[in-house]
């Protein structure tokens, strides 16, 4: 099974919603990751046939479906909201797409409803109505309805976003095992980097209606090709600092460290490789908050004098907001509960091994200092906060 989008464009009210989207997705799960307003829901609505594109083609398993109506597309859609028929029981909600198909006998419908309900862990709730269910049970019902009828493409638009943490973790694990090896194309959208890493599936990063990158999520996390990709896979947000590469060193706020070799190795003039001597070039340094420490660092660690502005304690972590050089904001994510006094001075430490060096526009990763590669064979072990 394959879903192919070729040059798909969509413009509404004078704004570009989708800009030349070209993707080829095969059977199994693919993650669609990006911030709010990236175009994730819009892209799914176009694939489902709810929004006609202004240009481009959509094919499913070799058949052009660009102009095919919603009813005639072999597509199921699960929304972020718990969308179920309130007057129908769980059983009837799941059975509804099967009855519309009108090609299954009653016994076949009953068997399929019960199979899917058991798969989703709601087999004992078939007689209840949606109002009698918890949020997690309602979303399981919505997903069961989407799974009831075999489809070529299954679209899940942030299906866990409205659930509490415990339910989200439980259902995420269930969905991951359920869709591994699926014969359908399963496109799952999320704005949560941790969710993308947990599913360990091929990933499309979307931003401002454009495809930013396609690849393995662990590799993108370890060595993001652009600042936009790094930002999409970082929560809390990245810390960004201005820097200059000069004479083979990276300079930042009075500190410096040897410029690492270009990533990927440069095949163009020496100025593209920060480790080589060449004209000075402005760069952007990015570091994740959990790689900023307070109170000490090892050999070669960069030290930044800072003023404490705010300490946010969440229980498992303390987010320390700092001001560098009187103008730059830096956040340190520290383990556990730690107490700090706003207005006091401290020193923030960053190991250059955890810095990404981007060009001044953030459009290209120039270097990733000794950032260890993450095995794509065990992507689920990637820890977003450690």
Predicted features and spans:
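A short, flexible loop at the N-terminus of ABC-type nucleotide-binding domains that lies
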Residues: 1-5, 9-20, 67-69
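Conserved ABC transporter NBD signature motif
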Residues: 56-64
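Non-catalytic connector elements of ABC transporters
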Residues: 13, 25, 35, 249-386
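Helix-to-loop junction immediately C-terminal to a conserved catalytic motif
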Residues: 48
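Conserved coupling/switch loops of ABC nucleotide-binding domains, chiefly the family-specific signature
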Residues: 54-57, 208, 355
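Short beta-strand immediately N-terminal to the Walker A/P-loop
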Residues: 30-32
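ABC ATPase nucleotide-binding domains
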Residues: 74, 84-228
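ABC ATPase nucleotide-binding domain helices that frame the ATP-binding cleft
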Residues: 41-44, 140-141
């Amino acid at each position: 099974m394959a879903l192919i989008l070729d040059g798909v464009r969509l413009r509404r009210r004078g704004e570009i919603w989708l800009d030349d989207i070209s993707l080829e997705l095969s059977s199994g799960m693919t993650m669609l990751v990006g911030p709010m307003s990236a175009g994730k829901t819009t892209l799914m609505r176009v694939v489902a046939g709810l929004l006609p594109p202004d240009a481009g083609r959509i094919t499913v398993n070799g058949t052009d479906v660009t102009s095919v109506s919603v009813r005639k597309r072999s597509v199921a859609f699960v929304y972020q909201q718990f969308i179920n028929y309130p007057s129908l029981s769980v059983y009837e909600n799941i059975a509804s797409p099967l009855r519309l198909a009108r090609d299954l006998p009653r016994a076949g419908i009953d068997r399929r409803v019960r199979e899917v309900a058991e798969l989703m862990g709601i087999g004992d709730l078939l007689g209840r109505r949606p109002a009698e269910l918890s949020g997690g049970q309602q979303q399981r019902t919505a997903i069961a309805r989407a799974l009831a009828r075999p489809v070529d493409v299954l679209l899940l638009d942030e299906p866990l976003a409205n659930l509490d943490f415990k339910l989200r973790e439980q259902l995420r694990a269930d969905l991951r095992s359920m869709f591994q090896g699926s014969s359908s194309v399963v496109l799952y959208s999320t704005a949560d980097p941790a969710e993308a890493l947990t599913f360990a599936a091929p990933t499309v990063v979307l931003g401002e209606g454009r495809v930013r990158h396609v690849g393995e999520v662990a590799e993108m996390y370890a060595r993001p090709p652009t600042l936009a990709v790094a930002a999409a896979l970082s929560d809390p947000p990245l810390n960004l600092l201005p820097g200059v590469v000069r004479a083979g060193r990276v300079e930042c706020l009075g500190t410096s460290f040897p410029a690492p070799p270009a990533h990927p190795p440069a095949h163009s003039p020496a100025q593209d490789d920060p480790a080589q001597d060449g004209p000075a070039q402005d760069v952007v340094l990015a570091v994740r908050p959990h790689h900023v420490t307070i109170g000490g660092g090892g050999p070669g660690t960069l030290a930044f004098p800072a003023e404490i502005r705010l300490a946010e304690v969440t229980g498992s972590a303390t987010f320390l907001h700092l001001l560098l050089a009187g103008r730059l904001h830096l956040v340190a994510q520290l383990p556990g509960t730690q107490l700090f006094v706003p207005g006091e001075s401290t020193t923030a430490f960053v190991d250059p091994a955890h810095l990404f060096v981007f060009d001044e526009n953030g459009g290209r990763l120039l270097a990733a200092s000794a950032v260890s590669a993450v095995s794509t064979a065990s992507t689920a072990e990637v820890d977003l906060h450690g």
